[in-house]
Amino acid sequence: MLVIKNGTLISMAGIYKEKYDVAVENGKIAKVEKEIVPGPEDTVIDAAGNLVTPGFIEPHCHLGIIDADGQDGNEMTGPIHPELRAIDAIDFHCSLFDRALEAGVTTVAVGPGSGNIMGGTFAYLKTAGATLNERIMKEEAALKMALGENPKVS
């Protein structure tokens, strides 16, 4: 178990708790208390003077699809491509996954760009994981559609 001690906690409801401890087990918050006594096998992080929050969720991004090394966000062979899947285009070795995780983003919805009226499906992923299977939460989660300026100019 991971025990984060003495942090200033901020809940998603905006509640602040100073000098609180958080226990994390199997990647999930197990308990939040004023004092958690770690066991001999536990990993302890002293978060004194630091903020501790739940992992952030990015509900719409192009991580691993559109980055400095490539542009796989839009399929420009036609305006309607519901059959395309973001999961098939994502570069899971993209360094931006690590940067997102370092910033506290633990979950992302990765999808195509707005160059098509119908551009394909999003995938829900974790930003951490040693293998692809550890990262994938849902391969097809939402269908990207765009109206207005973006598909008009593409």
What feature does the model see in each segment?
Residues 123-154:
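Metal-coordinating catalytic core of metallo-dependent amide/deamination hydrolases
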Residues 1-5:
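Extreme N-terminal starter segment of soluble prokaryotic enzymes
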Residues 21-23, 109, 122-124:
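Short beta-strand scaffold segments in enzyme catalytic cores
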Residues 115-116:
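Positions that flank functional sites
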Residues 9-53:
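Histidine-rich, glycine-flanked metal-binding segment
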Residues 50-112:
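Metal-associated gating/positioning segment near the N- to mid-region
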Residues 67-71, 119-124:
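Short acidic, glycine/serine/threonine-rich loops at helix termini
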Residues 45-46, 109-110, 145:
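General beta-strand structural signal in soluble alpha/beta enzymes
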